[in-house]
Amino acid sequence: MDSVVFEDVAVDFTLEEWALLDSAQRDLYRDVMLETFQNLASVDDETQFKASGSVSQQDIYGEKIPKESKIATFTRNVSWASVLGKIWDSLSIEDQTTNQGRNLSRNHGLERLCESNDQCGEALSQIPHLNLYKKIPPGVKQYEYNTYGKVFMHRRTSLKSPITVHTGHKPYQCQECGQAYSCRSHLRMHVRTHNGERPYVCKLCGKTFPRTSSLNRHVRIHTAEKTYECKQCGKAFIDFSSLTSHLRSHTGEKPYKCKECGKAFSYSSTFRRHTITHTGEKPYKCKECAEAFSYSSTFRRHMISHTGEKPHKCKECGEAFSYSSAFRRHMITHTGEKPYECKQCGKTFIYLQSFRRHERIHTGEKPYECKQCGKTFIYPQSFRRHERTHGGEKPYECNQCGKAFSHPSSFRGHMRVHTGEKPYECKQCGKTFNWPISLRKHMRTHTREKPYECKQCGKAFSLSACFREHVRMHPEDKSYECKLCGKAFYCHISLQKHMRRHTAEKLYKCKQCGKAFSWPELLQQHVRTHTVEKPYECKECGKVFKWPSSLPIHMRLHTGEKPYQCKHCGKAFNCSSSLRRHVRIHTTEKQYKCNVGHPPANEFMCSASEKSHQERDLIKVVNMVLPL
């Protein structure tokens, strides 16, 4: 046997199997198949395509290819469509009987090879099949692949890479994670997920890619016309497959179902990400902090947290971003587009994922459950954050003060305490903030938005803290009642905290003294009693505080701000606790009476005032009995 047939070394999928692959898997398939074809088409200058009429290299390439030419010359200078088309048109089968089983009425494999390549402009679906014959040059030995009778050649060397698709043998193993592959090209592409190598750069926007097919696919975003338009929302796409995937956001179709838990997904990529939650596999490990990740994309995002790189820059305002997703979110702030609207409350969203998460607020769905304590969560990030409270894992450590954090967002926020960075700026007044939530709260002072409304009196508030303070002014409004002791509360969170007193559930334990707490915030406050840490410093007088809430209250002493005003007499106070104590003068009955004296006429509103009064009376008595 003196020939190698392309189908012998190619991996093909049925139409049903091909539909299950996502874009990344299809790109990988094309890269490997194109590389295989290149190896077959340009092994040597003596190699020819054996067919009726003897199609030579000169017939295919249009010129004689020199011996030192590399495979890259084939792909760079010659159109795929012209090369493959000439091969297909000129090939004739010498032995129809031996190859009858290989003939296909339509070769879907070639369509897939050229699906993402801009050079394949011609339609090749009419070409019946590909049968590349290699004439073995003189002096080259034949190496028979015994299992299937395939013959391979390698000039002046032995066969180094036998075909292993059929046997399942995977001789090429990754030294980082141990994953094995049947082809060396597969391994090379996989290694890039560990070292972060992305050698293919888009000249238009500078974005990098690990594979040429991914780059070609991306370039179409800049150059190709979006001819496939969604009739429901008007959004346009480059190819039909992207439109098909998008339509599922309208129809709600979820064809990918997990066999483990029965959960269904609209996209194959989301389905594969979900399956890893069952296996727990985390092959991508960070060498800086030893944190492991299940997905290469998450791993790359994490690595940027160490380097601080911000390659994505907005041309409108100049703001730079570390992640493309954050950059895309920012760009929509300029356009203001929010295509996803909630039918329940009318709220609109920029992203489909945000819209779906919002829907859980109405449905009450909490799909993420903690196996240790049974607590359920709406969002996966909330679930992961909660899991770390049990394990005590804190991989993010501050180099300046040694404080460790469970989450990168908390770590970045803490670093701003040292650097003084306030990246979130109000465009209306120029005031800057450490956290985005602080900026959002501040923006309500300009927009006059007051989303928190009191059901008792109808008064609205812009901040939840002010709303809770106000609710306490209505003592009869306690709709959340404990079924065990009958105690009532203003909000369900207070009731949940109270219930742990009955169950004695204290999940959060101090490692230094063993004391346990019901809530992680209480544990954090307790830990500071051991460290005596006071990270919050007043820039005016240098006074330091343990808690972030204490610093703004203290700053009011310097600014003179008194935001809490008494409605009865107009007196103002710099903190809410002082206002509450003052309000008792107008509303509360004086329940504490002094029994010392004749008659016991002194009355007080609180026990602390009564004790202070009794101490003063005791000192007077002692001075009378024991005169100096």
From Swiss-Prot:
Transmembrane segments: none
Ranges annotated as C2H2-type zinc finger: 172-194, 200-222, 228-250, 256-278, 284-306, 312-334, 340-362, 368-390, 396-418, 424-446, 452-474, 480-502, 508-530, 536-558, 564-586
Coiled coil location: none
Gene Ontology, cellular component aspect: nucleus
Keyword list, A-Z: DNA-binding, Metal-binding, Nucleus, Repeat, Transcription, Transcription regulation, Zinc, Zinc-finger
Keyword Cell inner membrane: no
SUPFAM superfamilies found in the cross-reference section: beta-beta-alpha zinc fingers, KRAB domain (Kruppel-associated box)
InterPro entries with a match to the protein in the record: C2H2-ZF_domain, KRAB, KRAB_dom_sf, Znf_C2H2_sf, Znf_C2H2_type
Example GO BP: regulation of transcription by RNA polymerase II
Gene Ontology MF term list: DNA-binding transcription factor activity, RNA polymerase II-specific; RNA polymerase II transcription regulatory region sequence-specific DNA binding; zinc ion binding
PROSITE patterns in the record: KRAB, ZINC_FINGER_C2H2_1, ZINC_FINGER_C2H2_2
Cellular location(s): Nucleus
Domain KRAB: 4-77
Reported function: May be involved in transcriptional regulation.
Listed PANTHER family: FINGER PUTATIVE TRANSCRIPTION FACTOR FAMILY-RELATED, ZINC FINGER PROTEIN 977
Protein's recorded name: Zinc finger protein 555
Taxonomic placement: Eukaryota, Metazoa, Chordata, Craniata, Vertebrata
Gene: ZNF555
